[in-house]
Amino acid sequence: IGWLAKKNDTIFLRRGSRGHARLINEEIAKVLSEGKYVAVFPEGSTSDGTCLLNFHAALIQPALACGRPVLPIALSYWEPSGERSLAPRYDGDISLGECIRAIIGRKRTIARLITTPALGLNGEDRRQVAAAAREAIAAGAGLPLTSS
């Protein structure tokens, strides 16, 4: 999967390194200042998709510094019966291969992409924007918030 990510201009973050996060923020700011877009996954981890983990606010800072909006987008997966699908889960001991096999082994999984209003244009700080984005995504995807 790494080669695919590299081909699509992915900016890789070394987890747990504040110094590296600062470097990444500089790179994100450069991309944003060129008028391009950057997608970040502020949970910083994977889950089974049944709840929303805490958001890390650091990677939101470049958008605020560049005067660019933060556009929260929720992605959820559903069974044709209307129940939430766990087939795309990629957490715990599940390998990427197992995750992919679970997805392609399904006859049908419905993916829902929910957009929410732009944030960060009214002087909020990154933590306020992260909290508002988390709440918007949880509401849009119908997910409970977790504190872990």
Regions found by a protein language model. Name each.
Residues 36-42:
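Generic beta-sheet signal
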Residues 2-3, 17, 36, 50-128, ...:
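A cross-family acyltransferase "interaction/gating" segment
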Residues 26-30, 43, 67-75:
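Short low-complexity stretches enriched in small and charged residues
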Residues 127, 131-148:
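Cytosolic-facing loops and C-terminal tails of multi-pass membrane proteins
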Residues 1-30:
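Membrane-interfacial amphipathic helices and adjacent loop/beta segments
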Residues 46-47:
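Short active-site segment of divalent metal-dependent hydrolases/proteases
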Residues 11-12, 39, 114:
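Conserved beta-strand segments that form the floor/walls of ligand-binding pockets within enzyme
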